[in-house]
Amino acid sequence: NIQVDGGDVSFDLELSYPGKSQLDGLRKAAIAAVRSQVPGVENVSVNATIKIQTHAVQRGLKPMPNVKNIIAVASGKGGVGKSTTAVNLALALVAEGARVGMLDADIYGPSQPTMLGITGRPQSDDGQIIDPMEGHGVQAMSIGFLIDEDTPMVWRGPMVTSALEQLLKQTNWKDLDYLIVDMPPGTGDIQLTLSQKVPVTGAVIVTT
């Protein structure tokens, strides 16, 4: 969208990634480049914005509605900082101008409600689709919102996978650029099944 009116030039600069902190510097660099490289230019106006792209997912899967990109955060075992990495990644993306959601898929140790400082129960208008909770600018859903804090989880295998699929697909995510999935620790059937059924665009593996 380039417009030229005599010595006045204006155009749009659109980033396809979260870069709110870089917009001002890029705008100034673009203005300086036009003034130094194009003769006769007196005034330059640059409209710098962010429009995050949707990236490719696994074959046979389609991106979820209202979610551009899903990033899975996993680890080979518990206690290595996976959930901390997931929440810090989410908050960093929010700080850079992205719309971010967090799915706490760690059924046996849901920690995202505590990390995001969110309490209470999510609401549902129709008894099926659940509105996500929100904290620090992050839309969040966790099994921790739906059960009592001291209730032990005795689910295994297919029950866990089914519950996580419901949390993923029956949450009313609102126009997300990124959905961060805090995976259960380990590399068992649950993780393999989720990786085959969830349209993941990227992954972070937290190692020891």
Predicted regions and their residues:
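A short interface-forming secondary-structure element
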Residues: I2-R35, G40, N47
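Conserved catalytic-core segment of NTP-binding enzymes
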Residues: K28, L61, Q170-W173, D177-Y178, ...
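Residue-level signature of catalytic and energy-coupling elements of molecular machines
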Residues: V34, V67, G78, D104, ...
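Gly/Ala-rich phosphate-binding loop of Rossmann-like dinucleotide-binding domains
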Residues: R35, A90, V94, S195
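Short, basic phosphate-binding NTP loop
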Residues: Q37, E42-N69
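Walker A/P-loop phosphate-binding motif and the immediately C-terminal alpha-helix
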Residues: I70-I107
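Short glycine/serine/threonine-rich phosphate/pyrophosphate-binding segments
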Residues: G79-L89, P110-P113, M183-Q191
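Phosphate-binding loop that captures ATP/GTP phosphates
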Residues: L93-G157, T161-K169
